[in-house]
Design a protein with these regions (language model features):
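Bacterial N-terminal signal peptides
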Residues: 14-25
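The canonical Cys-X-X-Cys-His
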Residues: 319-329
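Bacterial N-terminal signal peptides that target proteins for export
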Residues: 2-16
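Short coil/linker segments at helix-helix boundaries
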Residues: 33-40, 49-73, 93-132, 138-238, ...
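Extracytoplasmic c-type cytochrome modules immediately beyond a signal peptide or single-pass transmembrane anchor
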Residues: 65-68, 73, 194-203, 212-231, ...
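Bacterial Sec signal peptide processing site at the extreme N-terminus
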Residues: 24-44
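TPR alpha-solenoid repeat register
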Residues: 87, 136, 174-177, 248, ...
Length: 329
């Protein structure tokens, strides 16, 4: 027979154990929550500035094979000054570039998926260090969605999606395009793809300052709005993205073709020719072939494969110039 005193003692011990565990959990929570945030760097080091130079040269040259060399320099600068938001973002971008243009690789290793994880890590650092930079927010959301797609992680997909909506609110001219580009590989009949295409139209509206005619979306009337200052500067070419304008219309045209609206896509593609830098654009031949083959490309663009040749019939997001299309000089 159990002693009533023994039963009572066991109850007291059980309560004490639960209380101790709760207290310990509370202490752990408080210890973590009250830890100081990593402080942003007050200045940028000479090492970081030298790494910047190599980063931009590699990107602007479209030197995909030079990514590893640039990564060494930029990560070295980050380790020296881990509070440098710009350097953290550059590491993230190199990882996302290597993943985005993986069609360039002759033999693709499963290890390429690590670039999505590392891109998210470094863009997370950049956002934490400089939460006011909306471009970092958009890149973080993009990397979250890329990682989620690889791992079939629905929770991370939703987190990335809503973070992207926040990024759009923070800088619509920039992140509406970013968001739509990320959605372009989705099935053409999916809600996400349709939303992504709507975001491209909204980008045009934001940049034009009015609603662009959906039936005849020539951008010729708005070319006088070209600016290098303010939030609308990202609508145009710049030293960061020397062919941003052309690349935008390449992607939007691809999305319209994929959606089956190849006739409107031809007008959208043709807008790229309005750029004063069009003659120097490395991918103008690809765009002109897309105009010619717009109707034939409807079926091709709905395939999920990635292209191997520069002119392969795949959407820009799946091509060898997924980033270089805007950034290569």
């Amino acid at each position: 027979m159990n002693s009533p005193h023994g039963s009572g003692l066991r109850a007291v011990v059980a309560i004490a154990t639960v209380a101790a565990a709760t207290l310990l959990a509370g202490c752990t929570f408080m210890a973590v929550q009250t830890a100081p945030a990593k402080p942003p760097a007050a200045t940028r080091s000479e090492t970081a500035l030298r790494a910047d130079t190599l980063f931009w040269k590699t990107l602007h040259d479209g030197d995909y094979d030079g990514i590893s060399r640039a990564m060494q320099a930029v990560k070295g600068a980050y380790l020296q000054t881990p509070g440098d938001a710009v350097t953290a973002a550059h590491v993230g971008f190199l990882h996302i570039w290597r993943l985005a243009e993986s069609a360039r690789q002759e033999s693709l290793s499963p290890a390429i998926t690590d670039d999505a994880v590392l891109a998210r890590k470094f863009f997370s650092e950049a956002v934490a260090l400089d939460p006011s930079e909306a471009r970092f927010q958009g890149f973080l959301a993009s990397s979250m969605l890329a990682e989620a797609a690889i791992h079939k992680d629905e929770k991370l997909t939703r987190q990335g999606y809503f973070k992207m909506l926040d990024a759009i609110d923070a800088w619509p001219e920039f992140n509406l395009f970013t968001a739509g580009y990320v959605m372009s590989p989705q099935p053409a009949d999916s809600a996400r793809f349709k939303e992504g295409l709507a975001w491209q139209w909204r980008t045009l509206d934001e940049c034009a300052g009015t609603t662009v005619d959906r039936r005849n979306p020539s951008f010729a009337a708005y070319m006088g709005l070209d600016t290098r200052t303010g939030p609308k500067r990202v609508c145009w070419n710049s030293w960061i993205a020397p062919h941003n304008f052309e690349g935008f219309f390449m992607n939007m045209g691809d999305m319209l073709v994929k959606a089956g609206d190849w006739a409107t896509a031809q007008t959208i593609y043709a807008n790229a020719k309005l750029s004063p830098d069009y003659a120097q654009w490395k991918f103008k031949g690809v765009l002109e072939e897309r105009i010619t083959r717009a109707e034939a490309n409807v079926a091709a663009f709905n395939l999920a494969s990635r292209g191997r040749g520069a002119g392969d019939a795949v959407i820009m997001n799946h091509s060898r110039f997924a980033c270089s299309g805007c950034h290569q000089r």
